[in-house]
Amino acid sequence: MITKADKNATRKKRHARVRAKLTGTAERPRLNVFRSNQHIYAQVIDDVKGVTLVSASTLDKDLALNGTGNIEAATKVGELVAKRAVEKGVKEVVFDRGGYLYHGRVKALAEAAREAGLQF
């Protein structure tokens, strides 16, 4: 019998393949995105030290959001993570889409981060 592949397991495999090629350094850390049904999370990570430099999510109290699982919320998270990263002196990052397609909420977060000052 043919079984349907688990989407999250497929995403994790795709993410592992991409992560084998992507690393964040102190000069150019990695902007990681995690998306759930209700929320979206973004972290700027220095993989050499294994340290999260800045993070933002739809759970932050700084963001007054009506809905948290939509493109508008992802845009605000992108702006916030970029603002916090620029304040810490990070201007360039490597974008890690977390195995998700570059579409919808992931794309909105990335474009908002670019407009707010991050380069990738």
Swiss-Prot record:
Tree of life domain? Bacteria
Q: Which NCBIfam families match?
A: L18_bact (TIGR00060)
Oligomeric state and partners?
Answer: Part of the 50S ribosomal subunit; part of the 5S rRNA/L5/L18/L25 subcomplex. Contacts the 5S and 23S rRNAs.
Note the HAMAP family from the entry: Ribosomal_uL18_B (MF_01337_B)
Which CDD domains does the record cross-reference, listed alphabetically?
A: Ribosomal_L18_L5e
Question: What does the entry give for GO biological process?
Answer: translation
Gene Ontology MF terms: 5S rRNA binding; structural constituent of ribosome
Q: Which UniProt keywords apply?
A: Ribonucleoprotein, Ribosomal protein, RNA-binding, rRNA-binding
Q: Which PANTHER family match?
A: 39S RIBOSOMAL PROTEIN L18, MITOCHONDRIAL (PTHR12899), LARGE RIBOSOMAL SUBUNIT PROTEIN UL18M (PTHR12899:SF3)
Gene Ontology cellular component terms for the protein in this record = cytosolic large ribosomal subunit
Q: Which InterPro entries match?
A: Ribosomal_uL18_bac-type, Ribosomal_uL18_bac/euk
What is this protein's name? Large ribosomal subunit protein uL18
Q: Which cysteines are joined by disulfide bonds?
A: none
Q: Which family does it belong to?
A: Belongs to the universal ribosomal protein uL18 family.
Specify the species: Bacillus cytotoxicus (strain DSM 22905 / CIP 110041 / 391-98 / NVH 391-98)
As for what it does, the entry says: This is one of the proteins that bind and probably mediate the attachment of the 5S RNA into the large ribosomal subunit, where it forms part of the central protuberance.
